[in-house]
Amino acid sequence: MVIHKKIRIIVSLFIIFNIIFLPIAKATNDSIYVWNNNGNKIDTSNRTTDAIQTTAEASNNVPNKTDTLGLTSGSAILIEQNTGRILYGKNIHEKLRPASVTKVMTILLIMEAIDSGKLSYSDKIPCSQNATKMGGSQIWLDTKETLTVDEMLKAICVVSANDCTVAMAEYLAGSTDAFVEKMNKRAKELGMNDTTFKNCHGLDEDGHLTSSYDIAQMSRELLTKHPDIKKYTTIWMDSLRDGKSQLVNTNKLIRNYTGATGLKTGSTSLALYNLSASATRNNLSLIAVIMKAPTTKDRFNEAEKLLDYGFNNFSYKQLSKKGEEVGKVTVIKGIEKEVK
């Protein structure tokens, strides 16, 4: 008799859960959704799925606005930061050269080392001969000088300094090769299945590839788990070495786009122009990734188009928090008359 009552209770609850459009019982997880401006809830269940196919046109549940946005970049993606929901995609799994957007992973590992206590912002970082030989963007480190982690992060985030990137990698892992192993391990943990890192800075190297989807994943991890990084990624102009070294952010959106919070630019002759751009407006945080844009102007313009599309068509609402009681349900023919 007791067993039959329990069965009736379970069946009743199941029916109620599927019929009534109300959040019931205690929330076991944060109930977070993305809503479009027509009032329709956007499903977030596929936010990290590996089932998304190579192109947005062929993938399931990946909105594609290529025709209306007119993007010329080889690959692009727009995601909502809190849920990871894909709001737009174009060739999101195409493997391309990331250039200095690679440094998002380098910065992530630095921030994780700080949060774990293995590193502090005040630690002094030496510069090796190897670090001084880096080409591309740099602040011309000298083997006789040391900079703090705080200063190194500023140089990496603002001017994409390759010499500082290598110095940090060597300090954390003993060598750049060992650090790259850590980068690839972390990429696998994040489900970045399109990615193979060959270096920590992003200069062109055969086999050093990733996708806009994967860049969005590591960007999301960095911004969500380590929001303090925005202290660096939102700097427009600053200086080092007692004002002798001037820094101007390579990400022009920091100056020109309302709500911009980062994140990282990258370009080489082979990669063309890349960008991971983040912004927040009205509690909605978005990440737009552009890869293989024809010109630097195109990458910023097209990132703006993606962000504008997101802010104009979606909004963010948190309906309940974990453990919060949000309602009661009447139980028919059950031991208890209602459950919370």
Task: Mark where each language-model region is.
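N-terminal secretory targeting signals
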Residues: 1-73, 319-340
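Extended aliphatic helical segments
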Residues: 2, 11, 34, 62, ...
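Domain-terminus/edge residues, biased toward the C-terminal soluble/receptor-binding domains
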Residues: 5, 192-196, 204-340
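Basic side chains
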Residues: 5-8, 90, 103, 186, ...
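A generic structural signal for short, solvent-exposed coil/turn residues
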Residues: 11, 19, 68-70, 117-119, ...
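Active-site-adjacent loops and short helices of periplasmic peptidoglycan-processing enzymes
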Residues: 27-226
